[in-house]
Amino acid sequence: MSLRIGLIGAGRHGSRYIHHLLHDLPGVSLAALCRKRIGEGRPSSLTTEVPIYEDYRALIADPSVEAVVVVTLPSIHPEICLESVRAGKPILIEKPLASTGREARMMVAAVEEAGLLLMTAQTLRFDSSILLLKEHWPKIGQCRYATFTSRIEAKADTSFRLPLPNQRGALLEFGIHLLDAVSFLTGEEVVSVRCELDQLPCVGPDTMAIVQLQTTSGMRFVLDIARVVKGRVARTEWVGPHGQISADWFHQHVSGTLSDGAPLEWTVQPQQTILSTLRAFVHAIETNSPPPITGRDGCRAVEVADACYRSAELGGAIVSVARDTREA
């Protein structure tokens, strides 16, 4: 019997989930879909007779839906999460888990109290280049410092939309990948940050962020995050006493050099990260086991983002990151 999943969100990113749920997951079916602009008709990728709801509450209440996947704006993640908790259904939520650490902590607390499964779709963790980097960067010794660069083209369909009050921008939207990657790759928590933004949320959504992070053991990272007109960049470079290593997850390339002069290069077998994320979610449900990226993981990344925004408000001051995901 197949696992029946309800998908909330059918935009550009949500359509990728639709495709995988329809075609790439044996034993899984798309039981229902919720889209905000229901008047636009059925998504072109939806080739089967799947019921479409305009209200996410109706989808979650649908008895044919056994688990929920959410690909919407983070501003409504908390209410969707709580509705899933009330219905007793496991839930996968696209990054960022929430707009603020306070909301994320509330979501995690509700899910844990109910004994339900919450997975955060930090999809970069499944990227082949990132996984190779995680495996091989210890060859360079204790990391002295590392840099991450993520520049993504501005969305062509959002220029006419008015931003929400105090809406966060690039740092939270896709920079959250990097904030999470530091902990994922090092196995350490980020304990302090410094951040500069091109504009604060009270003025408008940020489109550029320069962030300095420090982990528990003192490793230092510099993050360059920006919306650009053209030319995507997605790379990281690590420097240690025994060499350096770099990864490019846009061009799928990992290489390095050790202190003995030996060049290093690895063959990257690209993976479809959304598909890998869905498989992990399904496996966690079917085996009643913790997901590889928990709600607490997603919460922690949002808490680091909180500290970054606070630092920017303070003119780039060093700000400590809260440690307790259950802290109010």
Regions found by a protein language model. Give the residues of each.
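Active-site loop of classical SDR/Rossmann-like NAD(P)-dependent oxidoreductases
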Residues: 266-279, 293
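C-terminal helix-rich "cap/oligomerization" subdomain common to oxidoreductases
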Residues: 1, 67-70, 216, 283-328
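Hydrophobic residues in well-ordered beta-strands that form the structural core
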Residues: 54, 93, 118-120, 247
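Rossmann-fold dehydrogenase core element
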Residues: 106-123, 141-146
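N-terminal Rossmann-like dinucleotide-binding module
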Residues: 1-47
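Contiguous beta-strand/loop segments that form the cofactor/metal-binding neighborhood of enzyme cores
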Residues: 179-252, 278-289, 320, 327-328
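Beta-loop-alpha module in the N-terminal Rossmann-like domain of NAD(P)-dependent dehydrogenases
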Residues: 17, 48-110
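Predominantly a Rossmann-like dinucleotide-binding segment in NAD(P)-dependent oxidoreductases
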Residues: 124-202, 315
